[in-house]
Every structure is written in structure tokens, then in C-alpha cells.
Amino acid sequence: MGQGASTQTLNPNLAYITDDEVDHSMPESDGANPGAGNPSAKSKGKFPSLGKIFKPWKWRKKKTSDKFKETSEGLVLERKMSVRKPREELIERGLLKDIPENESNDVNHKAPPVKNGHTGPVPGDRKSDSGSEIDQDRRMDDTGERKEKRKRIGKRNDGTERMTEMIQSFQKMSLMQRSVGVQFVPEPKPASTSTKESQPPPKQAILPPKRVIAAPSSAEPAPVPPPPIAKPPPRTVSLNVDDSSRTILIPSLIAGDREVPPTVPAHTTPATVSTHKTLPTVPAHMTPPTVPAHVTTPAAPAHSNPPAVLLKQPPMPPPKPVHHSSNTALQGLDLSTVDPSQVPVPVKRSPPIPPKRNTPVTKRNSGDSSANLPEPPPPAPTSVPIPAAAPISAPPSTQSDPPSPTTEPPSQPPPLPLHIRIQRALNSPGPVHPNPEGSQRAHSLLFETPPDLINEALGGGRYSLPVTIEPLRLPEDDDFDMEEELQKLRAGPRPTQKPELEPRSRRGLVEDPQVAVIPEDAGSESSEEEEDESDSDQSIKYRDDNEEDDDEEDVPKSGLASRVKRKDTLALKLERQQEKEKSQEEDSSTWNNKEQWEAVRNKIGTALTRRLSQRPTAQELEQRNILLAKNEEVRRAERSEIKRRLTRKLSQRPTIADLQARKILRFHEYVESTHAQDYDRRADKPWTKLTPADKAAIRKELNEFKSSEMEVHEESRIFTRFHRP
């Protein structure tokens, strides 16, 4: 197609369509003029619709008029467009991805490759372009890009493609919570690579640091830098270490604000910043589709990387930040590179791996995990050189949220980032000096290994948890001895190689003594912040995560019901929290002597008796016909008593004369009252029921009467029918 890069929306929701797409994505008849509500060509006159009223067989549910539909859809679209997120925020959240197109029209258009309407870097022979030519190309490519977008939007009807895009966007959004922010500096490019610039960039491995790399002599000098532009928001990248047995999920680190390096014109190759901090991370595969091009992926991918994507890219103005792997605006950390002989062949991007939530398990030797690289690097040194000459490359500060472009820079230099300290702690078994400002407990749990574990690890033995099996004795057993149990409890813990763990920490030993899991309390504040951010634009969920959703039904509820349910769930949650606290207190109350044991026993006994006292009594159950009477004779006697009482009442009924005398019944003179024989009006007597033989006899008699005695008109005789029994 064209040379412009397409911005492809991963979310099919119209609220997230970018500026360029909104103009052309809506067809003119449906949503081009939303507020106006002009009728479409299909809308009919008034009189045909009047005719429908007088057809009673067509009085079904009236179809909503096209005019009304158009107006309502237009209003919805207008409202969605008014609350639409800006483009750079969508790119930062990963809902927009930039797809560079193949230059298929290379013969017709000889313009330089563009990215979002801006010229990209060109090969070394075009270094004399002026700024006006760049602007002209930019304008021309903008219009060309819009035309291409119109064609693409018309063609984008393939459902499977949209499904894959949605899946990728969900994976990306789930990975946004735990991601590592890394800012990249342009790689030092030797002059010999100018011939390869039309090919896709080699994805180099992120290796443990070897040394601070100086600029090679073949790099061309940088021009005089123009004034810096506004810094686009930093992008987040998640690093996963793929190993056969374990997965390391690096904690969420976002690079802090720092000064933006000067922009470089498109026709020049930027020189290398000589003194920069090397990034000591383990070799990683990038999970989301927003992968930097530096990462090597051995798997053969599903879609190939298009050409004309270069390692260096000029910085963009802030409204449209280029969401690309090698943006020069994202500088500050230089990746330690390999020699030109070690640079792998350009590989295609691997399909996105779904995020895994695993216990962070690390290895003793960090070099083990780099087995899939072209050449295994030596183990990383314990200290990372921090140059004093480069003020730009301040280490990123650990934050729980990516800073916005308007965030103020921190007043004091931020501490060392967490992943660097983890790397140091893994490489050097010795104690690391704790962070003065941070949480002491979390730091000690992360970086200070118990000495007996270090000795065990140095000895080369594999540490396993001691398992003791001891029969449990209950107070009901015959050989239960209180004094013996108390002595067992008072006796100190046996000297094992287990380190002393804090009572509620989640630190455990998983096959390897150098594993340290961060306890609950250390990460509580950041997790609360993340919860607040994630719940800010959704409904409040008062339920616990581990709670069963059995009572949740799919029945749509009214507004009042949902309000009442919200209050009820809040009250229930508070009740459950109190119950949990109580149960924790009860669990913690263990008995150490006989008095305490008696107290616990009495407590349980009172709770049980209270429960039993709330049970209904046998009398109540008998009254409610749940519990039957003791035996059949008593029940028969009760029944006969009830019968006798009722018959006495019926036998004492007053006669009509009595009622007339007592002026309860008043008859007029002309009403005759005769005494009739009293009979039982109840119809459930067996002698009142007709047997099948009786019914057959009645039918036979009736049919005989019809056939012989009943008069039938001659013309209707053909319609008569006599049923034989």
C-alpha cells in the first residue's frame, strides 16, 4: 500500500478511534452529521406509515424509525468522540500500535520512508537534505497516509483479524500492571552498516553488562543540537526470562523523568553517547507486541517485520509520539552491545506469549538462562559503573505509575532501581547495604540471605526442607497426658537448618536457598495504589477475590436493586472482615498450661450450647407437622377426640324455627320454609363415586334411549352416532 505507517486500533470500540480515523470510519449516511438528524434516503413519507394504522393484522411491535435510530446513533457517536482519549495516551496504554507498511509503491514514489507522516532516517548518501524538503515530504505523506487509511478502513472487514487484535490488546492491558520501563539510547552504528539500512534491524540480546562502551571511531560526528522538545510519556516494556524450568518476572519499574537529549536531524547518524550506564538485565524475550527491536527471539514468528524500520529515528513533536522501538526521545540508558561479529541475523518478531504469573524464582548462575543466545556472555560483575560525567543518564526511580509529561522532576537523585539491586544480590552472595529511605524489612528479606543458607550453597549441597512425621494426640485418647504435651510445647524448637521466618511473611524455600519472596506487607502500598487506579473508573466491588460467586445471577437488576445490593455487600464485607479478625485471634490463642486449655474448652462449649439453644424445640416441630407424634395410638386418640367435638357442635345446630324466634333469620310472609331431610353434602364418600361399570351402564341406557325413543329429524339423521359400551 502506501508509505505511511498505519495506526491500527486494537480496541474495536469507537471511543478509541484515533483522530485520523474518525473522519473516514463513519459512513456518510449513518454518522457523518450526528447532531443534525437528517433523514436517510430510505425514510418514507407520512402517508404510507399512516396506512399501517388501519391494518389490524399488522399491529405488532412498531419498528423504530430510521430517523430516530440515526439521531440516537449520532448522539452516541458525538458523546463518545467528546470523551475520546488523546492519541499519545492510547499509544502509551498499548491500545494503538504502529505498523510500518511494506514499501510496495517504491517504483512510483521515491520519497524517503515516513512514520506517522514524518520522515524517518535515510541511508548515508542522502545527508544534504534541507529542513524545508523534510517538511514538504511530511505534508505530502500526511495526505497520502489519509487516503491509504480510507482504503484500509473500507477493507477491514475480516473478523478473524479483529479477534486476534482484541486478544493482543487484552494481553497487553493485562501486562501493563507489571511492566518494566526502560528508556533506550540510539545504538552506536558503524559506517559499514549503511548498506544494510534498508533491512529490518537486528534484534540484539539484552546482555549482562560487560563494560561501558565508548563511541567507535567510525561513527560520524553529531551536528549542533537544536533546542530540545517536550518529552513524550515514557513507555513501559515487560521483560520475561524464559527458561525451561522457571520464569522470572521482573518487578514493575518505570523510568523517571529526566532531561530530553537534543533532537537529531533525519539525514545524520547520531553519535554514541560515550559514558552511559549499562543496563544489567538478564536476556529476555519481549512479551507484548510493543517489543523493542533490540531483543532477540529465537522462535519463528507468525508475521514478518517489514523493512525500512531503522534503529535510529528522529524525535517527534509531543502530540504524535512515535511508538517505535528505537525512539531517540527515549534515551538515558544504553544497552551493552555485542561485537559486530556477534550481531545475529535479522529475525522476525515472535508471536506474543500470554503473560504468566509465577513465583519469582531466580538461579544461582545468571549465565544459565542465556543459553539460547548466539554466544553465552561471562557472568555479570557485582558493581555497575555510574559515570559522573553524564547528568542525563540518572538511574530511573522506582514508581508505581508511569509519570505524565507534566510531572515535576524529583528534587533529590533517585535511588538505585530495584532490578539492578536484585541483579547485584544474585551475583554476589555477600550482604548488600540496605536502602536508607526504603522499607528495611522488605530490603532485608530481599537481599540478605541467612548465613547458614550461604554456607550450604557454597558447599554445593542442595537444601531441602526437613520432614518430620509425628502421630497427633487428642485429649480424647486414652494415653493423652497433659504434662507430656506441655513439656513438648515448652521444649525449644529443634536446631534445624531452617532460617527463622517471620510469623505471617510469605517467604519460603523453593528448592533453592537463594530464593526470596517479598512478604505481604512490603508491597501492600503499591498494590493498593494499583487497585485504586484500576477501580477508579469501574463499579465498586466489595467482594473478596477468593469468594465464590455462586449467588451472582445473570438476571438483569433494576437500579434500586443494584443500589440496595451494593449497600448489602458493603455491610456483608465489613461483617466478614470482623469475623476473619476474630477467627485469626482465636487461631493465635494457643494453650500453654491447664488453665488456658480449660478456658479454650469452655469457650468452645459455650459457643456450642448457644448454637444448640437456637434450635427449635420438639413442641414447635410437632406444631409445624415436622416432627410426628410418639406413637400411632396417641395420634388415633387425638383424632377421635377432634371428631367427637365437631359432631357435638353439628348436632347442636339450631333449627330454622329457633333462628326465626331469635330474629336471626327473617323471612317474608310469602316465603315458605319446609323441613327437608338432613343429608351429608360432602362428596368424598366412596358410595357417591361412580365405578367404571356404573358409567358404562349409564352410557348404554342413554344410547338405547337415543337410538329408539329420541326423535331425530330426517335430514340430521346422518349426523347422529350411537356409542356402543
Swiss-Prot record:
Biased composition (Polar residues): 1-12, 166-177, 359-368
Predominant cellular place of this UniProt entry's protein: cytoplasm
Localization in the cell: Cytoplasm; Cell projection, Lamellipodium
Bias (Low complexity) ranges: 212-221, 265-276, 292-313, 385-401
Residues in coiled coil: none
Acidic residues bias: start-end ranges: 522-536, 545-554
Comp. bias regions, Basic and acidic residues: 65-100, 124-147, 155-164, 497-510, 567-585
InterPro entries to which the protein is assigned, alphabetical: RPEL_repeat
Composition-biased stretches (Pro residues): 222-235, 374-384, 402-417
GO CC entries: cytoplasm; lamellipodium
Keywords: Actin-binding, Cell projection, Cytoplasm, Developmental protein, Neurogenesis, Repeat
GO molecular function: actin binding; protein phosphatase 1 binding; protein phosphatase activator activity
RPEL repeats by residue range: 75-100, 606-631, 644-669
Function of the molecule: Regulator of protein phosphatase 1 (PP1) required for neural tube and optic fissure closure, and enteric neural crest cell (ENCCs) migration during development. Acts as an activator of PP1. During neural tube closure, localizes to the ventral neural tube and activates PP1, leading to down-regulate cell proliferation within cranial neural tissue and the neural retina. Also acts as a regulator of migration of enteric neural crest cells (ENCCs) by activating PP1, leading to repression of the integrin signaling through the rho/rock pathway.
Subunit structure as annotated in this protein's UniProt entry: Binds ppp1ca and actin.
Protein name per Swiss-Prot or TrEMBL: Phosphatase and actin regulator 4A
Gene responsible for this protein: phactr4a
